[in-house]
Amino acid sequence: MTKSLYIAEKPSVAQEFAKALKQNMQRRDGYLESDQSVVTWCVGHLVTMSYPEKYDPALKRWSLETLPFLPENFKYEVIPEVKKQFTIVSNLLHREDIETIYVCTDSGREGEYIYRLVAQMAGIKDKKQKRVWIDSQTEEEILRGIREAKDESEYDNLSASAYLRAKEDYLMGINFSRLLSLKYGSAVASYLGTKYQSISVGRVMTCVLGMVVRRERDRKSVV
């Protein structure tokens, strides 16, 4: 007898799917299972982009000569802290009795990215994959999402945008953090009275930091 596999983004959401299915689910290690279905979960991201030293051990040492770091092909790896759950999900994806995979990660770009990375690392190719897109976690909405699930390929553009955003963030963070740390890290460390100071740069964090600094300056300028 074949079964359907439901993959949620987090355990709490997986529990809601299990309740909505109203099947006699039995608790297993990292998933729930009935005669008809298997429900499992990620714990947020299970896979991440590899640091430069995974491309070349020499890149562990920060140097201006090795910048910019622009790999032709990006490498990915399982996050060590969640390796056990990744292995559980990967094994379920490959189970012979699993006929259809329902992607139930959060309905959005990041949720799509979380699943695609898992499927990529697990090497899933020949399984039927369907996307559950819901606006809430009520029983009615979950069942509607399952009933109206579309082929996962219809979300390829969303996936592509997620991969592109992640690569952009990665390249900006790696290159500018190393560059500014090498150029100004010593000056910042001297000012702070520390031995060494790295300077972190990111698409979001740097903008937010700028907003905080601007707000603090405005506050101090008030007479």
Task: Label each PLM-derived region with a short phrase.
Residues 1-178, 207:
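Intrinsically disordered, low-complexity regulatory segments
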Residues 114, 118, 189-193, 214:
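Short alpha-helical interface elements
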Residues 163-167, 171-202:
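Amphipathic alpha-helical segments of the small helical/lid subdomains adjacent to P-loop NTPase cores
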Residues 197-219:
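Extended, Lys/Arg-enriched charged tracts that mediate electrostatic binding to polyanionic substrates
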Residues 221-223:
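Conserved small/polar residues in nucleotide/adenosyl-binding loops
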